[in-house]
Amino acid sequence: MSINSLQNLRFLVRYYLTEGGLKLPPEDRRELTPETVLEAKELYLSFIAGFNSWLRSQNISPINPVSLTGSSIYAPKDRENKERQNVTYGDIDYLVSFPTEYTTGDLTSRRKQESESVKKYTELLEKYIQIKRPNQLDVEKTLRSNVLMVIIRIPAGGFVQVDTVVTHPPYEEWMKGRYTPQRGVKGYVTGNLYKALGDYFTLTIGTEGVLARYKDKERVSSKVRKDVTIKSVSTNFKNFLMDIAEYMTGGDFTPDPLLLQHPGMDPENVSVSSLALGIAGLAKTLEERGILSSSEMLSKIYESFIVGLEENVGKKVTKDITQSQHDKLMKINQEQSKIVKDIFTGV
């Protein structure tokens, strides 16, 4: 398979799994309450266990189901909270690590090997479903398109879709945090703040940690693909902001107290405010080092953040959401943008 074909496969997998592609018509979908999510989780894990047994029987390394991710990661806590027992989620995402045999430390080459791993295990998954027809699934619906979007049959009636979010061993711990939103807040909010920070420094803060892309010794955006060298800045979710400071200064810096308090985030306690505080600490650190103006950096990041929030709501509107849903999104945007603004202007 050519490099371009592998890149296209990588894009399609991420497109389906980040854009929330749905196979199920509304009348077949179960409402995703905490109880339903946890029932679907057990059925999905049972399906993966069967797949892994089949892989082992052929001397193929098994995949590793890491954890629920996205908003549904809070289902266990929400089920125990009487005030949130009836909350519903937009979808169910499960983080799964596909084995990859790395033959080089070069990140560009490693990404090609990771894409090959995705292709291999996606094809094996499809073959397993066709041959074994696991009883946890609606086989026909699952095989209808991308098999990483698994249609689980709920014994009491109806179906749910579990989206397999693919990662690889070096990024498992990072992805536990990066794909976790703040509880009760849409994931696109934190996603836009990561993006605004990354865009300011021409870095990517995504599925493989914090990456810098170089062409002709200059950092370039992810839109530039040809003749690009990739450098890993951080895969440590608890320390990635400190790692960015080290990268930007070449290691010659004294962390601001705010950055010491918020060097990254706790995957178990992700919040917009914690990320904003860490970004503010990073700005103060780099200003003290004489690299940039803290106020200018925070102002530009905030402007990009706001544009991203507005674009997200605009995309939702084109999907015919109700006025009530639109108003709810606008309220979330207003509340979270105020939190970020207050932090950025208060340091």
For the regions a language model picked out, list residue spans one by one.
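Short linear clamp-binding motif
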Residues: 3-16, 340, 344
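Catalytic cores of NTP-dependent nucleotidyl/adenyl transfer enzymes across multiple folds
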Residues: 140-346
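Alpha-helix boundary/N-cap detector
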Residues: 4, 35, 39-42, 116, ...
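Metal-dependent nucleotidyltransferase catalytic core
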Residues: 37-52, 96-158
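Positively charged, low-complexity intrinsically disordered regions
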Residues: 8-11, 15, 80, 112, ...
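Helical scaffold of the NTase/Pol beta-like nucleotidyltransferase catalytic core
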Residues: 8-69
